[in-house]
């Protein structure tokens, strides 16, 4: 898997935990990483777990809020307290490269994305990642690499807030292939994108996908 060591100019350091609401985020971090350098953010202090639902409601009802920072001396404990307020689900996907160093992207819901999907009952999460890439792009015989990162994305379904944890793996593919986007999953295109051509694609994607590329350059 090619390293993304040349991408530093395009991305900023990721705080400890980001929970994405489409293109907005609640960020749980240490006090020194909080909103002081981010003019578009609001900083809120979590007194106890009972505050979490009201923070989520505030964020949902205020679309002009791009980011809420929750500073904490113990970000892991705070993150766990936030997670229990959601119905948690697991998913996995892959950052796939070929022998030329091109990356496999898909077009879904009008934005560029990486192939991913939900974990099935009893399935190892790395198996989920390979299966979903195969199903969504038609690429098989993938070589599984290291775990890159886990991203968090929340959404409301049937009146219930869900928090999706997505495990992202490096993958490689060495043979020619005819890409076959999974149209029943609203995927309209699958394409190999050269490293040099990535910036405009990454301007037309989700922040969580940018995070995957950011973390991959550190792998």
Model-inferred region functions:
Residues 1-7:
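Intrinsically disordered, low-complexity segments enriched in serine/proline and basic residues
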Residues 35-46, 97-134, 139:
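Conserved Nudix-box catalytic region and its N-terminal flanking loop in Nudix hydrolases
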Residues 49-93:
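Acidic, metal-coordinating catalytic segment for phosphate/diphosphate chemistry
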């Amino acid at each position: 898997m090619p390293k993304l060591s040349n991408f530093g100019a395009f991305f900023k350091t990721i705080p400890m935990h980001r929970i994405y609401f489409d293109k907005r985020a609640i960020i749980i971090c240490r006090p020194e990483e909080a909103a002081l350098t981010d003019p578009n953010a609001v900083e809120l202090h979590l007194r106890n777990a009972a505050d979490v639902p009201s923070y989520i409601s505030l964020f949902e009802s205020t679309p002009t809020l791009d980011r809420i920072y929750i500073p904490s001396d113990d970000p892991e404990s705070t993150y766990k307290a936030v997670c229990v307020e959601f119905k948690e689900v697991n998913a996995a996907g892959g950052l796939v490269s070929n022998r030329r160093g091109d990356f496999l992207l898909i077009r879904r819901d009008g934005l560029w994305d990486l192939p991913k999907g939900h974990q099935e009952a009893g399935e190892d999460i790395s198996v989920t990642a390979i299966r979903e890439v195969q199903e969504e792009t038609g690429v098989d015989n993938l070589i599984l690499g290291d775990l890159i990162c886990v991203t968090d994305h929340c959404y409301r379904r049937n009146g219930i807030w869900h928090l999706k944890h997505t495990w992202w793996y490096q993958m490689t593919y060495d043979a020619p292939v005819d890409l076959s986007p999974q149209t029943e999953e609203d995927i309209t295109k699958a394409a190999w994108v050269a490293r040099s051509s990535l910036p405009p694609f990454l301007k037309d994607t989700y922040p969580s996908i940018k995070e995957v590329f950011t973390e991959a350059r550190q792998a």
